[in-house]
Amino acid sequence: MMSESNKQQAVNKLTEIVANFTAMISTRMPDDVVDKLKQLKDAETSSMGKIIYHTMFDNMQKAIDLNRPACQDTGEIMFFVKVGSRFPLLGELQSILKQAVEEATVKAPLRHNAVEIFDEVNTGKNTGSGVPWVTWDIVPDGDDAEIEVYMAGGGCTLPGRSKVLMPSEGYEGVVKFVFENISTLAVNACPPVLVGVGIATSVETAAVLSRKAILRPIGSRHPNPKAAELELRLEEGLNRLGIGPQGLTGNSSVMGVHIESAARHPSTIGVAVSTGCWAHRRGTLRVHADLTFENLSHTRSAL
């Protein structure tokens, strides 16, 4: 068991690790996002689309060179944590994440995006009531922590929708719901977007799953072959809309479509859509019990 002084040192160390990682992902896109954007850029045939993709890559390089966020909207910080029950700082992790966000806000710097409901006052720290939002997944007997950080920008959050369908609407209803939302709303979400689809029983379970879907590496597939096929068919169909980069038409509309699902009630089909913009700022950090860590999402970037 750690002494109090050793535990405080460990808390300070992990806070610094998470703060540095959070600041870094505001500046640098994850490897899979950069690779996908390059693929779409190389495949683009419209002159306007080519100009926009060139501007995106110029923007990404300037963000690195100047060590500044790649987009001025650095979002509301969310954490999706998969942590072992024997991780030595499990009890302190919630407060560590909050402190890390406040430190990253100064280091990056991050735009102040936490406004208290009803009071309508910006806290100026990117923390507040229920913020940063943390979703927990406790792994029995594990001693690692896998921390996924997501910056939920305003533009890419606005298209988010959730609905409960009648079972008679079937998977055709799911497809219709996805197309209605992306075709009408994604144009203002800084496309090409990454589309997350959650399918479950209720609006809240589907919504959480849709958000988790956009945290997966681009191009990863659902383990169920039928779901994986639907991911590909949705991606192909949405790209035919020709929304293009920044909504100004082009060959592609989306970077990908990911589906996450849970068993549903026989009488309902809950479906939700979440989107990530082209500057999809998310990162995955694995921290071991001895506080050594692995940067899983940005292997080309050192902390």
UniProtKB/Swiss-Prot annotation:
Signal peptide: none
Example GO molecular function: 4 iron, 4 sulfur cluster binding
Keyword annotations from UniProtKB, A to Z: 4Fe-4S, Iron, Iron-sulfur, Lyase, Metal-binding
Induction: Induced by tartrate, via TtdR.
InterPro entries to which the protein is assigned, alphabetical: Class-I_Fumarase/Tartrate_DH, Fe-S_hydro-lyase_TtdA-typ_cat
Keyword Phosphoprotein: no
Catalytic activity: (2R,3R)-tartrate = oxaloacetate + H2O
Residues that hold iron-sulfur cluster according to the record: 71, 190, 277
Necessary cofactors: iron-sulfur cluster
EC number per UniProt: 4.2.1.32
Family membership noted in the UniProt record: Belongs to the class-I fumarase family.
Assembly, per entry: Tetramer of two alpha and two beta subunits.
PANTHER family: FUMARATE HYDRATASE-RELATED, L(+)-TARTRATE DEHYDRATASE SUBUNIT ALPHA
Entry protein name: L(+)-tartrate dehydratase subunit alpha
Annotated organism of origin: Escherichia coli O6:H1 (strain CFT073 / ATCC 700928 / UPEC)
